[in-house]
Each structure stands twice: as structure tokens, then as C-alpha cells.
Amino acid sequence: MTDSPVLALTKDLISRQSVTPEDAGCQDVMIARLEALGFTIERMVFEDTTNFWARRGTQAPLFAFAGHTDVVPAGKLEHWHTPPFEPTEKEGYLYGRGAADMKGSLAAMIVATERFIAEHPDHQGSIGFLITSDEEGPFINGTVRVVETLMARDENIDMCIVGEPSSTEVVGDVVKNGRRGSITGDLTVKGTQGHVAYPHLADNPVHKSLLAIHALATTEWDKGNEYFPPTSFQIPNVQAGTGASNVIPGEFHVQFNLRFSTELCNERIVERVTQTLDQHDLNYDLKWTYNGDPFLTDTGALLDAVVDAVDSVNQTKPALLTTGGTSDGRFIARMGGQVVELGPVNATIHKVNECVKIDDLEKLTDMYQKTLENLLA
């Protein structure tokens, strides 16, 4: 039995061992298909990261698919039922690293676009593809660099579907219409190292910091809003001391992260954290890493088109949520356009035995094609 176009392409992409930031030829496969459709291709290589921007048409609106060809490492091979880079069908599922995150989405985007253009060769507006090999890594030379390049020449995406695995139980049951922002602080509180038997000759930075850390951890940053939960403050890492039980540490390192809603901004968070630390008279250094601002698409033609597309395939409308971590959508949203995420079920992403339901690949292709028809036919 011959594989369907989307299944065959998904298998081809999975078989390429594109562990971040490697692309392993995935983009060449996609580019060849897009060139055959009349897309203009612009490869953008920044250091170790491979990206491309493809566009068909010159008119507005500019609708784009966005995604990544890189995958996370497979982990321990002995825990996989099948080789992670040998796509394998079993009981209605396709197994392999990247099946759900997100080579299935990439294949669905390509096939949906091929079908749409075959039926509507003179479609309205323009179609774009923004593809990177640096989403699972440090996200320094990937989508953000492509976005900066496009914005510098005033080529802004009006509407974008990011193919992240948004679904929970069945494909299309959840569409992400926004994401929280993320900011990380690396705090070093300085004291004076000494012997625990002579505390008067030392200055314990852990003791001095606890009240300030407690104050930050119990702060009500905001109340959230209709679309976002309240901002959360979490401490993932702390470190102090030499490992010896008789040495007062000279420094105390605390790393914390805030996931914040549209009720807050980076600048306000920095201001409030600094105020709290200063109130406790600490000698400290604080370095910030800005991981992205929150974004929200609460209304608009894209959201209407996607909701209708999902409903036409599933006979039920998707839930619109902003839960989860960050995605490259945060960079694309800087252009001021509408951004949503729609992709496969995320139950096995980043796990051994990652898989996608084969029928879901067909449904996702139909959803993407229907979205194109709703917007550009």
C-alpha cells in the first residue's frame, strides 16, 4: 500500500537525524517542494543554524507557516521500541523522533499548500514559510534572526500558524492563541566565607537572602486576565557552599524564572525585583535573560479561519488556550500580526517513543488547507 503524501513526507523528514541545531537536509526537501510551486527561496544561515524564508506572491495579506526542522536528542536508545530515526508504523501510529514535534506539522504544511495552490493557482495575498533548525536549542540564530531580517526591510507577516504540537487528546482540540512571556534572573548574593564555629568572623549570604527570596516567592505580581493566569515566580536552581559541613559559604546563587501575562512587562518585573532585593540590604549581582514577551491573538481573521477549519474537520470547535512554555511565536508576534499555534497531540513530545497518530496527519493537513482557503481563496 502506497503511503499518502503527508505520511511519506513525514517519514522522509523523520529519517533525517536533525538533532538541534543540525538540519540534516530536511530544509532541502522542503525547499524543493516549494520551488516547484513557484516560491522564491531565501536561505539564511547564521553561524551553526540553517533557516529559510520562502514566499509566493507579492500582495497583502501575507500568511505564513512557521516551524522547525531540528529535534531534541533521542535519549537512551534502549528505551525506544523502534529506532528513533527509522520511522515506523505500528497500530495506527507513526513512531520516530520529531513525529509530533514537529516534522508531522511540516509535512502537513507542505502538502496542504500543494493542494491549495493546485486548486487556487491565482490565490489572493501571499504565502510564506519561515523554517529554522534552532528552536529546540538556544534560539539565538533561528527564527528571531529571520524575523529581524524581514522587519528591517518592512516585510512583515500579517498572519502566521506555528506548527507546534498544541493538541492534547485529539488533533485540533486546542489552538494556542497566545503564550506567556518568560524572564530568568541569575542572582548572586555576596557574603564572607568562614568557619561555622566562628560565625562572627563570617557573613552568611544564605541567611541574609532568605527573607528577600521568600518575599519574591510570595509576591502577587498580578491577577492575570481573561486569557492568562497570574504571573508565576519559580526557583529552579540554588547553589551555595563547598560541600563541606563546616564552611559558611561566601556566595549564594539563586536562579529564578517568571512566566508572565500581558498584565506585566520585562521592565516592570526588573524594577519590582530590584526594589525587593534593595529593601533587604543585600550585596548582590543580578543578571537577566529575556526569553520573550507574552503575545495574544484574541480576535481577527486568522483566528476565525483556524477555528472554522478545525470545526470543519472535527465537527467541534477548539479550545483557545495560552498555557505551556514559550515558542517561536513570540518572535513572529513582534511584527504586529496575528499568531496562533496548531499542531499534533503533544503527549509524547521530547519523550522516548515519540509518535503521532497517522490519521491525525491527514486531519492536520486538511485543517491547514481549509485555513488557506478561508483566508486566500
UniProtKB/Swiss-Prot annotation:
Entry annotation: catalytic residues: 70, 135
Pathway: Amino-acid biosynthesis; L-lysine biosynthesis via DAP pathway; LL-2,6-diaminopimelate from (S)-tetrahydrodipicolinate (succinylase route): step 3/3
Record has Zinc as a keyword: yes
A GO molecular-function annotation: zinc ion binding
Cofactor field: Zn(2+); Co(2+)
UniProt keyword annotations, A-Z: Amino-acid biosynthesis, Cobalt, Diaminopimelate biosynthesis, Hydrolase, Lysine biosynthesis, Metal-binding, Zinc
Metal-binding as UniProt keyword: yes
SUPFAM superfamilies assigned to the protein according to its UniProt record, in alphabetical order: Bacterial exopeptidase dimerisation domain, Zn-dependent exopeptidases
Residues bound to Zn(2+) 2: 101, 136, 350
InterPro entries reported for this sequence: ArgE/DapE_CS, Bact_exopeptidase_dim_dom, DapE_proteobac, Peptidase_M20, Peptidase_M20_dimer, Peptidase_M20A
Documented EC number(s): 3.5.1.18
GO BP terms, alphabetized: diaminopimelate biosynthetic process; L-arginine biosynthetic process; lysine biosynthetic process via diaminopimelate
Catalytic activity annotation: N-succinyl-(2S,6S)-2,6-diaminopimelate + H2O = (2S,6S)-2,6-diaminopimelate + succinate
CC cofactor note: Binds 2 Zn(2+) or Co(2+) ions per subunit.
Sequence positions that bind Zn(2+) 1: 68, 101, 164
Domain of life: Bacteria
Task of the protein: Catalyzes the hydrolysis of N-succinyl-L,L-diaminopimelic acid (SDAP), forming succinate and LL-2,6-diaminopimelate (DAP), an intermediate involved in the bacterial biosynthesis of lysine and meso-diaminopimelic acid, an essential component of bacterial cell walls.
NCBIfam families: dapE_proteo (TIGR01246), PRK13009.1 (NF009557)
Subunit architecture: Homodimer.
Family: Belongs to the peptidase M20A family. DapE subfamily.
Protein known as: Succinyl-diaminopimelate desuccinylase
Phylogenetic lineage: Bacteria, Pseudomonadati, Pseudomonadota, Gammaproteobacteria, Vibrionales
